[in-house]
């Protein structure tokens, strides 16, 4: 048995899709365990760039099983669209498996997401408006509709009718918005269910059988630890648990079957959406990093907020996710910056904080304590090993590893999978 979890150590967009794609080559099963189509990942495969939101990165390998786990919330319309997107590009999806226990995003979730965000005005969270939060709310309230329900027309119709009574009342009375008729949803979404029916099964059985058979299983997280509903910058978070612990709940695999956790980070920090960001750069260096790193959201297209590497954030991620391996991406983006800074702690009302505070009010008052390091000007995009890097780049990686307390296992010097380099295997035995 060999199992590896890939998690983002920051606020998402760390390049998890690329690293998952890279690690997929030596995996036999690739599974997502939380989130929905609010997560976007860009993958280059055989010279072609693909943008996916729901389907795991391993779909491009015909000999590997790809799983959408029970912890995900699935927009059937978005899923059918993504399947068509792959089919048009001659990518087979025969290896896809979808949990019959995953919850379904319906049109009223999308509308509630949008009107609630609009109502909040200046206090908005920065949601992607994909219906993720409202779908997870229904799940917690035990009124959600699952994939298994979607496939049974009678059950789907009964639950949909009951839910629409409540949702329409909410939309019309609280938000002064138009509600839905059952015929607006029933036939269309039942048909989507029929289109994905061939992929639906009990994915917990698929995953546990694979692990028991000694196959390599790779769990692909979405978003990042700082967007985790329990461990992130609440309430500026997602509605699920991207931390490694989310694997056990969101995939139906017990915690004793998880071996290694790869924490993916950029060599700097980015964020989409609102919320405190201690190392944010609102200057020319920030603009340079954004343009060189093409820091625009895969899902939203929004410019990402950019800042220096924050070791306080990544140490927090290491602790709450049990991270065993560091994958550092986008090192090449920092080329040409004369002096680099790494945040080693926060200063809060005269006190030095080395751990991430829970209070957003306190976080907003925190000033980053920086350590400066000399940059490099050499082109590093062709580096294949640490020894190929200029001395200053090597020292930067070493210092990041020291400050976060995570051994460096992978580093990346460009967007292509050929620019991803292994320092030590994450599939090693315990």
UniProtKB/Swiss-Prot annotation:
Keyword annotations: Cytoplasm, GTP-binding, Ligase, Magnesium, Metal-binding, Nucleotide-binding, Purine biosynthesis
Q: What is the top EC class of this enzyme, as a single word?
A: ligase
Residues noted as binding substrate in the record, renumbered to the chain: 298-304
Q: Where does Mg(2+) bind?
A: 13, 40
Q: Name one GO cellular component term.
A: cytoplasm
- Name the cofactor(s): Mg(2+)
Binding positions for GTP? 12-18, 40-42, 304, 330-332, 412-414
Q: Which GO terms describe its molecular function?
A: adenylosuccinate synthase activity; GTP binding; magnesium ion binding
SUPFAM superfamilies assigned to the protein according to its UniProt record, in alphabetical order: P-loop containing nucleoside triphosphate hydrolases (SSF52540)
Binding residues for IMP:
13-16, 38-41, 128, 142, 223, 238, 302
InterPro entries, per database record? Adenylosuccin_syn_GTP-bd (IPR018220), Adenylosuccin_syn_Lys_AS (IPR033128), Adenylosuccinate_synth_dom1 (IPR042109), Adenylosuccinate_synth_dom2 (IPR042110), Adenylosuccinate_synth_dom3 (IPR042111), Adenylosuccinate_synthetase (IPR001114), P-loop_NTPase (IPR027417)
E.C. number, please? 6.3.4.4
- CDD domains, from UniProt? AdSS
Q: Which superkingdom?
A: Bacteria
Q: Which reaction does it catalyse?
A: IMP + L-aspartate + GTP = N(6)-(1,2-dicarboxyethyl)-AMP + GDP + phosphate + 2 H(+)
Query: Which pathway does this chain act in?
Result: Purine metabolism; AMP biosynthesis via de novo pathway; AMP from IMP: step 1/2
* Principal place of residence: cytoplasm
Cofactor annotation comment? Binds 1 Mg(2+) ion per subunit.
The UniProt entry's GO biological process terms, in alphabetical order, are: 'de novo' AMP biosynthetic process; IMP metabolic process
Tell me the function of this protein.
Plays an important role in the de novo pathway of purine nucleotide biosynthesis. Catalyzes the first committed step in the biosynthesis of AMP from IMP.
Q: Which family does it belong to?
A: Belongs to the adenylosuccinate synthetase family.
* NCBIfam families the UniProt entry points to: PRK01117.1, purA
Full protein name: Adenylosuccinate synthetase
- Organism encoding this protein: Bacillus licheniformis (strain ATCC 14580 / DSM 13 / JCM 2505 / CCUG 7422 / NBRC 12200 / NCIMB 9375 / NCTC 10341 / NRRL NRS-1264 / Gibson 46)
Organism ancestry: Bacteria, Bacillati, Bacillota, Bacilli, Bacillales
């Amino acid at each position: 048995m060999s199992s590896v979890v890939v998690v983002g150590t920051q606020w998402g967009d760390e390049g998890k899709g690329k690293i998952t794609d890279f690690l997929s080559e030596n995996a036999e099963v690739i599974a997502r365990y939380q989130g929905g189509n609010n997560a976007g990942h860009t993958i280059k495969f055989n010279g072609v760039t693909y943008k996916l939101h729901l389907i795991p990165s391993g779909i491009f390998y015909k000999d590997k099983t790809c799983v959408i786990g029970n912890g995900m919330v699935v927009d059937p319309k978005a899923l059918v669209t993504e399947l068509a997107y792959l089919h048009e590009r001659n990518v087979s999806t025969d290896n896809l498996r979808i949990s019959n226990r995953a919850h379904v995003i319906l049109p009223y979730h999308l509308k509630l997401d949008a009107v609630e965000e609009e109502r909040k005005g200046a206090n908005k969270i920065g949601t992607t408006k994909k219906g993720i939060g409202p779908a997870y709310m229904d799940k917690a309230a035990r009124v959600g509709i699952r994939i298994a329900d979607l496939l049974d027309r009678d059950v789907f119709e009964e639950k949909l009718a009951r839910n629409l009574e409540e949702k329409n009342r909410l939309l019309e009375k609280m938000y002064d918005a138009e509600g839905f008729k059952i015929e607006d949803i029933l036939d269309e979404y039942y048909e989507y269910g029929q289109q994905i029916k061939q992929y639906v099964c009990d994915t917990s059985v698929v995953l546990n059988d694979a692990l028991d058979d000694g196959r390599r299983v790779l769990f692909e997280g979405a978003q990042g630890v700082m967007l985790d509903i329990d461990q992130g910058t609440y309430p500026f978070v997602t509605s699920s648990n991207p931390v490694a612990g989310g694997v056990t709940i969101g995939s139906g695999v017990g915690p004793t079957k998880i071996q290694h956790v790869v924490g993916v980070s950029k060599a700097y920090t980015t964020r989409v959406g609102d919320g405190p960001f201690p190392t944010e750069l609102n200057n020319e260096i920030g603009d340079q990093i954004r343009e060189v790193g093409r820091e625009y959201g895969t899902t939203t297209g929004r410019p990402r907020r950019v800042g220096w590497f924050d070791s306080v954030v990544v140490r927090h991620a290491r602790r709450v996710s049990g991270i065993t391996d560091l994958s550092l991406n986008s090192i090449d983006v920092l080329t040409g910056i004369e002096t680099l800074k790494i945040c080693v702690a926060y200063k809060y009302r005269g006190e030095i904080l080395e751990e991430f505070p829970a209070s957003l009010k306190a976080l907003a008052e925190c000033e980053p304590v920086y350590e400066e390091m000399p940059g490099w000007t050499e082109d590093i995009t062709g580096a294949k090993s640490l020894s190929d890097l200029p001395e200053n780049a090597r020292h930067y990686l070493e210092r990041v590893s020291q400050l976060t307390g995570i051994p460096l296992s992978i580093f990346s010097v460009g967007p292509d999978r050929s620019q991803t380099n292994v320092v030590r295997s994450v599939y090693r035995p315990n």
